[in-house]
Amino acid sequence: MQFKDILNKYLKETNSTSKELSTTSGISESVISRYRSGKRTPNINSPHIITLATSLSILSKKNIQINENIILKELTTSLNNNFNYENLSNNLNNL
């Protein structure tokens, strides 16, 4: 699964909107929109990853309880899986 798929899955499971996630996380709605559409993904070391996991966990408490660590693990794993090895190979070949 890609980052956007996991983010959308948790928003759906928590029955939350992008606006609620933005308000809870402090991340702008436009950035969340880009994350949700896949137009942008955070760097694996970005504080947005932890912020999103924490915020989704907080939002889950209004409906179902989702563990922050589980969310964080899924989000970071998806970013590791998105690495473009073909692009790296092409860049190295151009050196």
Question: Over which residues does each language-model region extend?
Answer:
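Basic, amphipathic alpha-helix used for nucleic-acid engagement in HTH/winged-helix/SANT-Myb modules
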Residues: 1-6, 14, 29, 85-92
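A short, Lys/Arg-rich alpha-helix, primarily the initiator
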Residues: 1-20, 24, 50-53
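Recognition helix of helix-turn-helix/homeodomain-like DNA-binding domains
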Residues: 26-44, 73
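Short amphipathic alpha-helical interaction patches enriched in hydrophobic/aromatic residues
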Residues: 11, 36-40, 60
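Non-catalytic, surface-exposed connector residues within folded enzymatic/regulatory domains
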Residues: 1, 43-46
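Short, charged recognition helix plus adjacent turn
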Residues: 64-95
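Extended interaction regions within the primary functional domain
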Residues: 8, 18, 37, 66-69
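DNA major-groove recognition helix of helix-turn-helix/homeodomain DNA-binding modules
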Residues: 45-64
